[in-house]
Design a protein with these regions (language model features):
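Long Lys/Arg-rich low-complexity intrinsically disordered regions in nucleic-acid-associated proteins
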Residues: 1-226
Length: 226
């Protein structure tokens, strides 16, 4: 499936340097026969108790208070500690609600649909982000918010979160979306300067996520000798 990332006004930005997208298969780490430690599987929902969290409706902050819930969520790659509070981000909360592994309480109890409805008012891209987040988590990866490029995530392979920096940064794009090549190249350059590989996550109209890895190639002017 081709991705139209060029426009007439920005083709010159890629005259001598091209970013080429190659389809890449992200390994499903849940099926790795060498991994015998099911307790470290971030998608092993059978071993995950139903956690409880509270929501502050004014800022949508999701807080987990009980130590037993904090420990089990942390072991599965969910949540971060900020100002001595254990916080779940919106996508983690949606994912856990969708798998019936979280009870969320505020002025009322929220389920997946009611929480998503609130998030859509704040972030029109939340569903795009969630589809990518869900797909990566289902493959066994730990997924964290990115660096502010839009729909981007840091991707950690099993057992690496908290021990090693993320190797990949994923950028989400909806199928059929036209983006300027100059902006695209600038984003990839910034990610590359961080020492990370860029993975483009394209969401097809049916909801399937296809991944492309970017490769930078330089082209030199081919002059004929007189």
């Amino acid at each position: 499936m081709p991705i139209d990332i060029t426009s007439n006004e920005s083709k010159n930005a890629m005259k001598n340097e091209e970013i080429i997208n190659n389809k890449v298969h992200l390994e499903n780490t849940n099926n790795n026969p060498n991994n015998n430690n099911n307790n470290n599987n971030p998608n092993n929902n059978e071993s995950l108790l139903i956690a409880e969290a509270t929501i502050q409706e004014e800022d949508l902050k999701i807080i987990v208070n009980e130590i037993r819930f904090k420990d089990q969520l942390r072991n599965k790659g969910f949540g971060e500690v900020f100002d001595n509070e254990f916080i779940l981000n919106s996508l983690e909360t949606l994912y856990l609600l969708s798998n019936n592994k979280l009870k969320l309480f505020g002025k009322k109890e929220y389920n997946f649909s009611s929480f998503l409805k609130i998030l859509l008012k704040k972030d029109k891209k939340i569903l795009t982000k969630y589809l990518i987040f869900r797909d990566l988590r289902s493959k066994g990866y730990v997924v964290k918010e990115g660096f502010g490029f839009g729909t981007d995530f840091r991707i950690y392979e099993r057992g690496e979160h908290g021990k090693k920096p993320s190797k990949y940064v994923s950028i989400g794009i909806n199928e059929g979306l036209n983006i300027k090549s100059k902006d695209f190249v600038n984003t990839v350059d910034q990610i590359e300067k961080m020492g990370k590989d860029t993975v483009i996550a394209v969401i097809e109209r049916r909801g399937e996520v296809i991944y492309y890895k970017t490769i930078k190639m330089s082209f030199f002017e081919n002059k004929k000798k007189s």
